[in-house]
């Protein structure tokens, strides 16, 4: 059991640390508010925010107003989404052109892929650059995937098109904890 003399230095140490921790917390808050004031004064071109002595409440109110008004204005992401879709469409067209330029590609495979690629139109609201699927690691697939011949096209994780015929395949699911 600890004696009373051992506990008191710990309490005294905590009492000394408490104001230091509080001072650091206030410094962080004030630094963040100052950065926010500068950002808002540049974004809103507000004269009252250019004054470094502006109240903290005023900075926070301007921030709320800025965020509310930015929700109402159409975002540049809508324009970016259209650019993404046109790029995606261009990529599909390039893939079709490349595939059709290969005379040695199996006719059934070429017809199937041409039909799939030409019929694909991404929904306008569903696709955006931030929604693109992330590539999955291929570590778990290296040993489990069968080697495909030159006239074989993998259509989905469970089906393969071989000379115009579907053949079922099974892949082991990659799990990072295994």
UniProtKB/Swiss-Prot annotation:
Any idea which UniProt keywords this protein has?
Developmental protein, DNA-binding, Nucleus, Repressor, Transcription, Transcription regulation
Mind telling me which Gene3D superfamilies this protein's record contains? Helix-loop-helix DNA-binding domain
Q: Which Pfam families match?
A: Hairy_orange (PF07527), HLH (PF00010)
> Residues in domain Orange?
84-116
User: Where on this chain is WRPW motif (motif)?
Assistant: 174-177
Q: Name one GO cellular component term.
A: nucleus
Indicate yes or no for the key word DNA-binding: yes
The answer to whether keyword Transcription regulation applies is yes
Please list the GO biological process terms of this entry. midbrain-hindbrain boundary development; negative regulation of DNA-templated transcription; negative regulation of transcription by RNA polymerase II
What compartments host this protein? Nucleus
Q: Name one GO molecular function term.
A: DNA binding
Q: Where is this region: Disordered?
A: 122-147
Q: Which SUPFAM superfamilies match?
A: HLH, helix-loop-helix DNA-binding domain
Query: bHLH domain spans which residues?
Result: 13-70
Give the quaternary structure. Answer: Transcription repression requires formation of a complex with a corepressor protein of the Groucho/TLE family.
Described function: Transcriptional repressor. Represses transcription from both N box- and E box-containing promoters. Demarcates the prospective midbrain-hindbrain boundary (MHB) region in the neuroectoderm in early gastrulae embryos by repressing transcription of a number of target genes.
Q: Provide the domain comment.
A: Has a particular type of basic domain which includes a helix-interrupting proline.
Instruction: Please identify the protein, giving its name as recorded.
Output: Transcription factor HES-7.1
Which lineage ranks, top first, belong to the organism behind this chain? Eukaryota, Metazoa, Chordata, Craniata, Vertebrata
**Gene that this sequence comes from:** hes7.1
């Amino acid at each position: 059991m600890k004696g009373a003399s051992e506990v008191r230095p710990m309490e005294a140490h905590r009492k000394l640390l408490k104001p230091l921790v509080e001072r650091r917390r206030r410094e962080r808050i004030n630094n963040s508010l100052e950065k926010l004031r500068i950002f808002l004064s540049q974004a809103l071109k507000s004269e009252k925010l250019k004054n470094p002595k502006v109240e903290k409440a005023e900075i926070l109110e301007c921030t709320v107003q800025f965020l509310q008004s930015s929700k109402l204005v159409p975002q540049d992401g809508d324009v970016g989404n259209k650019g993404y879709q046109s790029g995606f469409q261009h990529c599909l067209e390039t893939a079709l052109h490349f595939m059709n330029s290969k005379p040695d590609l199996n006719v059934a495979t070429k017809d199937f892929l041409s039909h799939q690629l030409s019929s694909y139109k991404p929904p306008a609201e569903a696709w955006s650059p931030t929604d693109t699927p992330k590539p999955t690691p291929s570590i778990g697939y290296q040993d489990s995937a069968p080697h495909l011949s030159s006239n074989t096209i993998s259509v989905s994780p469970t089906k393969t098109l071989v000379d115009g015929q579907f053949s079922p395949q099974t892949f082991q699911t990659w799990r990072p904890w295994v």
